[in-house]
A protein has these predicted regions:
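Sec/Tat signal peptide C-region and signal peptidase I cleavage site
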Residues: 18-24
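Positively charged n-region of N-terminal signal peptides that target proteins for export
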Residues: 1-5
Length: 125
């Protein structure tokens, strides 16, 4: 094997050990919080990550609009300024993985539970 071949082989071995898992087609519901976590932790530049970001952003925006329209109790109150999308999704993944029962919840229930714990509303809201 040439030096170039050895270098490529060594790089692949090193990358494989710490590489994010590939999301599968079954995760693209996403039916559970675990499915959403798999999508959010896929290899960067993978369609799964884009799906995760779009799903989360869409769900949050719809819920925020519902909170304004129905004027009931709010599930969460976003801080000002809000966290970056990458920061929030990283925190969500860590939160979900910290307790296996969270992974079995529906994807939106898990996301909103995380947000309600991370960004609770003041008692008056």
């Amino acid at each position: 094997m040439t030096l170039k071949g050895c270098t490529v082989a060594a790089a692949l071995v090193l990358l494989a050990s710490g590489a994010p898992r590939a999301a599968t087609e079954a995760n693209f519901g996403p039916n559970t919080t675990g499915d959403l976590v798999e999508l959010c932790t896929a290899i960067p530049d993978n369609a799964a990550v884009n799906f995760c970001e779009g799903f989360a952003q869409g769900a949050v925006l719809v819920e925020m609009q519902n909170q304004v329209a129905f004027r009931g109790p709010k599930l969460f109150c976003m801080p000002n300024p809000p966290p970056s999308r990458n920061q929030a999704l990283s925190e969500f993944v860590n939160w979900a993985r910290s307790s296996p029962d969270r992974l079995a919840q529906s994807s939106t229930d898990g996301l909103f539970r995380f947000l309600s714990e991370r960004s609770p509303c003041p008692p008056s809201l």
